[in-house]
């Protein structure tokens, strides 16, 4: 789960990490009053969306007067901001964060993430801050340093010292950086985050360190432990179909293709998407109905898939283990009758009660194309929509 920058900074401040000060705006009528409350010479108006690249897209503006700040805030609120992470459709700006500007001596990058390949927690730091870290990794990888932390032993003093020295800090800045590293680590562990990113972490002209921007992502499986974090969720920033699917116990991710996929199991779902592309088409979604799906969940899955107007055909690929093929077939038929599916539907079944499931489909009287294996299914759905 992602949260907004102003929420991330609120969490960091609770852990003693210095951040820039500001106020959030959720309605246009709050803009003038909010800006009047800020006692500063420089105003920074920031669009709050769950995507990076805001600055390059015009979602971050720096001005030196109240009137300019008010005009820019009014102009920015409600626009559709398109960045390299939002896709061409963009994201509507429904919140602004207006904060005090500050003089910057140097910018750094600092983050903590789960390194799944190494099964450990990893700090990532760079002297090239304020820019896309992926670009730094591609063009100047030598500017990035990593420190891995064994979960069994936890954060040690040598980790904190090492990060501070690698970034070139000296004297009091080393002490400040060690405190930031420790606080970020504690926040990461205690909130069940999967990423905390400060970009940029700056050195001000007075030599002090400050988190100028912040991003935090949380493990959704641990949200039940953190009602205060869950309360920060902004459903306006999430795909409504993905939210609807989650509420139905389905794992759904919308994509850009035209063939809807309904599969049980994440691995099989990814294999299904791969083979659709292999046969010359593109998947419209990732949808895992899970191992315990019933007729109602199957119907809801179809409704979600077909609510995407780009879908020209649907491929159902089920391996019956815990979930029996006859139950799946009954759910498919019930959904087809209720929804009136008007696009080609290809079904491939294997596993528990597969023959029973195929018989139910063949006796249904519906226009359902059956396939005997995955390659046959992909070939048939691609042919059907061509």
Swiss-Prot record:
Question: Pathway, per Swiss-Prot/TrEMBL?
Answer: Carbohydrate metabolism; tricarboxylic acid cycle; succinate from succinyl-CoA (ligase route): step 1/1
Q: Does the keyword Metal-binding apply?
A: yes
Top-rank lineage group of the source organism: Bacteria
| GO molecular function annotation | ATP binding; magnesium ion binding; succinate-CoA ligase (ADP-forming) activity; succinate-CoA ligase (GDP-forming) activity
Pfam families, sorted: ATP-grasp_2, Ligase_CoA
Enzyme class, broadest EC rank? ligase
Question: Could you say which EC number(s) this protein's record lists?
Answer: 6.2.1.5
Q: Which residues bind substrate?
A: 264, 321-323
Named cofactor requirement(s):
Mg(2+)
Q: What is this protein called?
A: Succinate--CoA ligase [ADP-forming] subunit beta
UniProt remark on cofactor binding: Binds 1 Mg(2+) ion per subunit.
The answer on whether this UniProt entry bears the keyword Amino-acid biosynthesis reads no
Keyword list (alphabetical) reads: ATP-binding, Ligase, Magnesium, Metal-binding, Nucleotide-binding, Tricarboxylic acid cycle
Describe the family membership recorded for this protein in Swiss-Prot or TrEMBL.
Belongs to the succinate/malate CoA ligase beta subunit family.
Binding-site positions, ATP: 46, 53-55, 99, 102, 107
The role this protein plays is: Succinyl-CoA synthetase functions in the citric acid cycle (TCA), coupling the hydrolysis of succinyl-CoA to the synthesis of either ATP or GTP and thus represents the only step of substrate-level phosphorylation in the TCA. The beta subunit provides nucleotide specificity of the enzyme and binds the substrate succinate, while the binding sites for coenzyme A and phosphate are found in the alpha subunit.
- Please tell me one Gene Ontology term that the record gives under cellular component: cytosol
Query: What positions does the domain ATP-grasp occupy?
Result: 9-244
Reaction equations catalysed:
succinate + ATP + CoA = succinyl-CoA + ADP + phosphate; GTP + succinate + CoA = succinyl-CoA + GDP + phosphate
Which InterPro entries does its entry note?
A: ATP-grasp, ATP-grasp_succ-CoA_synth-type, ATP_grasp_subdomain_1, Succ-CoA_synthase_bsu_CS, SUCC_ACL_C, Succ_CoA_ligase-like_bsu, Succinyl-CoA_synth-like
Q: Which GO terms are recorded in the biological process aspect for this UniProt protein?
A: succinyl-CoA metabolic process; tricarboxylic acid cycle
């Amino acid at each position: 789960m992602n949260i907004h920058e102003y929420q991330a900074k609120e969490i960091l401040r609770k852990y003693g990490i210095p951040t820039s000060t500001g106020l959030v705006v959720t309605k246009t009528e709050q803009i003038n009053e909010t800006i009047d409350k800020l006692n500063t010479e420089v105003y920074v108006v920031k669009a709050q969306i769950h995507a990076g690249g805001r600055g390059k897209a015009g979602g971050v503006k720096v001005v030196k007067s109240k009137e300019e700040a008010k005009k820019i805030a009014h102009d920015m609120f409600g626009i559709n901001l398109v960045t390299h992470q939002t896709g061409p459709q963009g994201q509507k700006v429904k919140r602004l964060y207006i904060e005090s500007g500050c003089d910057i001596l140097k910018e750094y990058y600092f983050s903590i993430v789960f390194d799944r390949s190494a099964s450990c927690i990893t700090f990532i730091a760079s002297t090239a801050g304020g820019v896309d870290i992926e670009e730094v990794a591609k063009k100047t990888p030598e500017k990035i340093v990593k420190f891995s932390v064994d979960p069994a032993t936890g954060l040690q003093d040598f980790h904190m010292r090492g990060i501070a020295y690698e970034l070139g800090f000296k004297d009091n800045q080393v002490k400040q950086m060690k405190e930031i590293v420790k606080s970020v680590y504690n926040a990461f562990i205690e909130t069940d985050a999967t990423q905390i990113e400060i970009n940029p972490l700056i050195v001000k002209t007075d030599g002090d360190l400050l988190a100028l921007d912040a991003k935090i992502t949380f493990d959704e499986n641990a949200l039940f432990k953190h009602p205060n974090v869950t309360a920060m969720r902004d459903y306006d920033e999430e795909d409504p179909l993905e939210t609807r699917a989650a509420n139905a116990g389905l794992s759904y991710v919308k994509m850009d293709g035209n063939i809807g996929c309904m599969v049980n199991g994440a691995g099989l779902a990814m294999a299904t998407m791969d083979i659709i592309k292999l046969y010359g088409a593109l998947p419209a979604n990732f949808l895992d109905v899970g191992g315990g799906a019933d007729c109602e969940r199957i119907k809801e899955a179809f409704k979600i898939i077909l609510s995407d107007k780009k879908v020209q055909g649907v491929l159902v690929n089920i391996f019956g283990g815990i979930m029996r093929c006859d139950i799946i077939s009954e759910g498919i038929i019930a959904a087809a009758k209720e929804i009136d599916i008007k696009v080609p539907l290809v079904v491939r079944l294997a596993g528990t009660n597969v023959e029973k499931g195929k018989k139910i489909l063949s006796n249904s009287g519906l226009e359902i194309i059956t396939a005997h294996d995955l390659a046959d299914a992909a070939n048939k759905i691609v042919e059907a929509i061509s």
